[in-house]
């Protein structure tokens, strides 16, 4: 909490890295930024290692041929904690099959997800088409026409909720 003293936070292991960064920032903002980026990169590597949808650098759950019969259905926009599970911080994947008519194949497709909390990578037919960091930023992506197919296409969004409420939550 914002009113918790530094002395109290020193006894909470989860705050050790951030307290170190804040103390460094008092004298060397560049060093603090480097420490923050290293801490964040380590955290992302830990999260990616736990993500069953990733196999190394391959987003296997973005594969349009993936069998998702056992996946649960949900509606968006909604926070993950309200629509799926109350205690999730981490990665969750969303998929939607979209049927495109032949007349749509001549131009790039524009996708607007609205805001996503906190980060996302958007795939179309297994190919990444956009990525955004920031919890309150509208997502606007362009799908090149060479990725479009007549009939079924698959939109996949990997959402990384870093804490608090998360998900695809705003109006698109």
Task: State the predicted function of each range.
Residues 1-79, 135, 145-172:
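An acidic-aromatic loop/edge-strand motif
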Residues 60-61, 71, 98, 103-126, ...:
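Aromatic-lined ligand-binding clefts that engage carbohydrates, nucleic acids, or primary amines
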Residues 67, 92-94, 118, 137, ...:
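Residues that flank catalytic or metal-binding motifs in active/ligand-binding sites
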Residues 78-84, 89-92:
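Alpha/beta-hydrolase fold catalytic core
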Residues 82-84, 117, 123-141:
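Solvent-exposed beta-strand/loop surfaces of large extracellular or lumenal domains
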Residues 87-89, 104-105, 134-136, 148-150:
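Surface-exposed coil/turn segments at beta-strand junctions on protein surfaces, enriched
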Residues 88-101, 139-141:
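Short beta-strands within extracellular/lumenal beta-sheet-rich domains
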Residues 91, 113-115, 134:
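Short solvent-exposed loop/turn micro-motifs enriched in small/polar/acidic residues
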């Amino acid at each position: 909490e914002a009113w918790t003293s530094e002395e109290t936070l020193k006894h909470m292991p989860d705050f050790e890295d951030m307290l170190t960064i804040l103390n460094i920032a008092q004298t060397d903002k560049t060093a603090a930024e480097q420490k923050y980026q290293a801490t964040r990169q380590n955290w992302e590597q830990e999260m990616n290692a736990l993500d069953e949808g990733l196999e190394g650098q391959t987003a296997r759950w973005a594969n349009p041929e993936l069998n998702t019969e056992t996946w649960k259905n949900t509606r968006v926009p909604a926070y993950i904690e309200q629509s799926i599970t109350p205690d999730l911080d981490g990665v969750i994947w969303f998929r939607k099959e979209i049927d495109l008519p032949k007349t749509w194949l001549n131009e790039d497709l524009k996708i607007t997800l609205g805001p996503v909390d906190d980060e996302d990578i958007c795939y179309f037919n297994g190919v990444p088409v956009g990525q955004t960091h920031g919890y309150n930023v509208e997502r606007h992506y362009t799908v090149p026409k060479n990725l479009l197919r007549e009939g079924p296409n698959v939109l996949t969004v990997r959402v990384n909720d870093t804490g608090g409420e998360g998900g695809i939550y705003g109006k698109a």
